[in-house]
Amino acid sequence: MPHSSSGAPLDPVAFIHSQIRTVPDWPQPGVMFRDITTLLQSPKALRILVDLFVERYVDAKLDYVAGLDARGFIIAPIVAYELSVGFVPIRKVGKLPYKTCSESYDLEYGSATVEIHEDACRPGDRVIIMDDLIATGGTMMAGRNLLQRLGAVVVEGAAIIDLPDLGGSTLLRNAGLPIYTVTEFAGH
């Protein structure tokens, strides 16, 4: 277990939570943006975060870690590397060069689409899907649907942050996707 500068054992979840910056009224008034760049800038925080995910999934017999565009691309490949499994990108529409499968989902105002290469995984492959944050759950649900369409077994959805007041983690769990998040923040 990591230790604080005083030598006392460090609560890794509380430490990760403390490393996330809140930016009020960004990108629009009323939004409290949870900025993970401060967490990523700290080698200690990044190591603790990666270790939390690796400890959770080391015995899960995974084939891949899938990351959601864009901030899921930051942590998912590191976790995949540490677990000695492959990384699968799930991208915004029009960003992948090969044949793709796509899935649209609703946003608060409008919709969006994500894609995956049609050969990204095989039937029966065990995959976790990662993002930085779960808000409404739409992106992770779309990613799960794409992976399942390719025949993958989606073991769990994982994120650094949950915003439970927005209902995404509940929506995902109710749809049968187990969810793991390191920390949560009230509000949005």
Curated annotation (Swiss-Prot):
Which Gene Ontology BP terms does the record give? adenine salvage; AMP salvage; purine ribonucleoside salvage
Q: Which family does it belong to?
A: Belongs to the purine/pyrimidine phosphoribosyltransferase family.
Q: What is its EC number?
A: 2.4.2.7
Supply the alphabetized keyword list. Answer: Cytoplasm, Glycosyltransferase, Purine salvage, Transferase
**Functional description taken from the UniProt entry:** Catalyzes a salvage reaction resulting in the formation of AMP, that is energically less costly than de novo synthesis.
Q: State the CDD domains in the record.
A: PRTases_typeI
Q: Spell out the reaction equation it catalyses.
A: AMP + diphosphate = 5-phospho-alpha-D-ribose 1-diphosphate + adenine
Cited PANTHER family: ADENINE PHOSPHORIBOSYLTRANSFERASE, PHOSPHORIBOSYLTRANSFERASE DOMAIN-CONTAINING PROTEIN
* Protein name per the record: Adenine phosphoribosyltransferase
Primary location recorded for the protein, binned into one broad class: cytoplasm
GO cellular component terms?
A: cytosol
Which taxonomic lineage does the organism of this UniProt entry have?
Bacteria, Pseudomonadati, Pseudomonadota, Betaproteobacteria, Burkholderiales
Source species of the chain: Burkholderia vietnamiensis (strain G4 / LMG 22486) (Burkholderia cepacia (strain R1808))
- UniProt-recorded Gene Ontology molecular function terms: adenine phosphoribosyltransferase activity
Where does this protein act, in terms of pathway?
Purine metabolism; AMP biosynthesis via salvage pathway; AMP from adenine: step 1/1
